[in-house]
Each structure stands twice: as C-alpha cells, then as structure tokens.
UniProtKB/Swiss-Prot annotation:
Record region (Disordered): 1-66, 294-322
Start-end of Basic and acidic residues biased regions: 8-42, 294-310
Biological processes annotated in GO: snRNA import into nucleus
Keywords: Coiled coil, Cytoplasm, Nucleus, RNA-binding, Transport
Gene: Snup
GO cellular component: Cajal body; cytoplasmic U snRNP body; nuclear speck
CDD domains: Snurportin-1_C
Chief localisation class: nucleus
Localization terms from the record: Nucleus; Cytoplasm; Cytoplasm, U-body; Nucleus speckle
Name this polypeptide is given: Snurportin-1
Biological role stated in the UniProt entry: Functions as an U snRNP-specific nuclear import adapter. Involved in the trimethylguanosine (m3G)-cap-dependent nuclear import of U snRNPs. Binds specifically to the terminal m3G-cap U snRNAs.
Coiled coil: 274-330
Higher taxonomy: Eukaryota, Metazoa, Ecdysozoa, Arthropoda, Hexapoda
Compositionally biased residues, Basic residues: 52-62
Organism: Drosophila melanogaster
Quaternary structure note: Interacts with components of the snRNP complex including SmB and Smn; these interactions are RNA-dependent. Interacts with importin-7 msk but not with importin subunit beta Fs(2)Ket; the interaction is RNA-dependent.
Length: 351
C-alpha cells in the first residue's frame, strides 16, 4: 500500500489530486479485504486484535491495555466527484478519545492511549451485558461530562471495524434508539449522545444542517467543524483520506456550500487561498510539535515516573486540540466583540 502511495508523489500530482487517488486506492483495498473476510469468517472473540507500532520501550506498557487508536481525518482539499457517497458529521469542541466497555467496567482513553477515567455504563461489555466488548470513538465534553459518539469499532458481540461507515452509523443509531445511553442512572454514570450524520444524497438535509446556528442547543458545546465520512470506508486506527475535515468557514470555498453567517472566519483567512490556509495551519502545528518536543526533552532530563510519562503523553496526544484552542483564542481577539446578532456564550476550552 505504501509503495502505491509513494508512486503518486513521484508523479508530481498536487496534494488534492493525490488525495483523490489515495481515496480510490483505499476504497479498493478495503472492499477486497471485506470480501476476503467474508470468505473466511471468524467470530469476534477469535479475531486477533491489531497490535500498534511501539514508539519506544518505556511506553509499551500502556499500549497493551488499548490496542486501538482513534481514526484521524485529513483536510478535505477538493470537492469529491462522488459527493453523494459521503456523510457529514458535525463535531463538537472537546477531547477526542476511545471509550472501551469490557469485563464489567468502562474506561476512556486519550488519543495517545492513556486511560483518563473509568466508570460504570450500560454499554455492552459493562453492567449486565458483560459478553463481548464495546469500543466507541467519541468526543468528551468535560463541562457537560458527556461523551459525543462519532463512530464505533465494536458494539458488544458485533465487530463493525471492517464494516462500511454507512452500516456502522445505521447500527449505532439502532442501538441508541433501543437504549437510553444518554440518561444518567446507577448503571450508567455518564451520558453518551450519538452525533447526527447527514447524507449528501439529501441536499436539503445538509443545507439545513449547515445553516443551523447554534448547531447544539445554546451553543453548548461549541461546534468545532465538520467531518466527512465516505460511506464505503472501513474504520482504520490511523489517519485516513476517507475521513476528512473542514472548519465551518471553509465549507463554501471548498464545496460551494454556504453556512450560517455566524460562523466567522479568522481575519487572515482568504477565501481564494483556502489550501494555503490549510498549509499554514499545518506549519503552525509542526512548530507547536517542535515546542512540545523541546519541553518533553527537558522533562526527560528529570527523574521519570509513571505520572510524568502520563502527563507527557496527554500533552502529545492532544497537541492538535491545544493548537486549535490557541488559534481560536487568537481569532476571538482579532474579531473583538461578537456580532450581537450572532452572540454566543463564552466557549469552554478544548481539552
């Protein structure tokens, strides 16, 4: 797979065209893999879970507890030719994490694999339904103490990682309609809310979602941006071109779809140079990473203990959220007071 992608770079294709080609190649590979697995089906409990690449010996211990990582998106650098084959998911500001219900307990793990909370839930794998394992891809909003569910790797005895995104979303919707996972109870200590998805085959539904402001009641939580899932894509525990991302103010410039005027763009954003803005954002992110590495190097010179290591990993795993918060604060300062017609309450810092 890597060699075919390297060929795209050798051909000198622009980044947007490279993304198109990688999307087609991955869809082809995933479809073939699903067909092979159907021909040689194995129950979930007998499947070998993916083993992540170890970054270093000192961090291998915590990875044994969570052999998965969240699926990460790329910038959407072009309007897909098959836009009707994509789903739109509005994403709130919060802490990206994986929630695992297994062996009678539910645990939430940061992007770096560190457990930051454990509790009881009514998800399959916890409470009375301890058979199987549930792994949900979520955004945790601390102020509301709520997990907003994006996607799933497994749900009880049902393995869905290799299923198409359209089926995964359908399956989750059906399960959430059957159970009150968004209600606090003795056996469900935290709320789980399934995020809505909108099919580009229904332009009116997408248009309504883009013009809704605030998207979440009372703007709590804030809308961070929009995720785009290809309907036929499997869930992969890494960055993938089959899940893409745009900030609200980019929607019209990339897709030709206007959004509510209350979604303000930064002053340095130029609609005709949206790709350059993405590149500049990535450059700022790279600089932020270098700063983090320097800070971690200083920490490593001190005596290490598990708490120090955990703090390091949390900083690294949430580096994107940290940078986003800095840029958002910068943008708010540039804008000054919000337009009174679009007034919004102070937003919580992204975790």
């Amino acid at each position: 797979m890597e060699s075919s992608f390297q060929e795209l770079y050798k051909k000198g294709l622009d980044i947007g065209e490279q993304q198109k080609q990688r999307q087609k190649e991955l869809l082809k590979q995933q479809k073939l893999r699903r067909q092979q697995e159907q021909d040689d089906y194995r129950p979930l409990q007998n499947q070998e879970k993916p083993v992540p690449r170890k970054k270093s010996g000192k961090r291998s211990g915590h990875q044994k507890g969570i052999p998965y990582r969240p699926q990460l998106s790329e910038w959407l650098r072009h309007k897909p030719d098959d836009l009707n084959e994509w789903l739109l998911v509005p994403c709130p500001v919060g802490k990206r994490c994986l929630v695992v219900a297994s062996k009678g307990i539910t645990k939430a793990y940061s992007k770096g694999g560190w457990m930051f909370v454990n509790f009881r839930s009514s998800l399959p794998g916890d409470w009375q339904l301890q058979k199987g394992e549930t792994i949900l891809d979520c955004v945790y909003v601390e102020d509301a103490d709520t997990f907003y569910v994006l996607d799933a790797i497994s749900f009880g005895l049902q393995e869905v990682q290799e299923c198409e995104a359209s089926f995964r979303f359908y399956w989750l919707r059906a399960r959430f309609e059957e159970h009150d996972y968004d209600k606090i109870s003795e056996n469900n200590e935290k709320k789980f809310k399934l995020l809505d998805h909108f099919d580009f085959e229904d332009p009116s539904a997408v248009e309504q979602a883009l013009h809704k402001y605030p998207f979440f009641p009372e703007n709590k939580p804030d809308l961070d941006g929009f995720l785009f899932y290809h309907k036929e894509a499997s869930y992969v525990c890494r960055e993938t071109p089959l899940v893409c991302w745009l900030f609200p103010f980019m929607m019209e410039d990339v897709l030709g779809l206007p959004v509510n005027k209350c979604y303000k763009a930064p002053e340095d954003y130029q609609p005709s140079h949206v790709l350059q803005y993405m590149d500049a954002f990535e450059q700022k992110l790279a600089e932020h990473r270098r700063t983090l590495k320097e800070q971690k190097k200083k920490v490593n010179e001190q005596k290490e203990d598990p708490h120090t290591m955990e703090a390091e990993e949390d900083v690294e795993s949430d580096e994107y959220d940290s940078l986003k918060r800095v840029l958002d604060q910068q943008r708010r300062l540039e804008l000054g007071e919000f337009d009174m017609d679009c007034a919004e309450p102070p937003s919580a810092d992204g975790c």
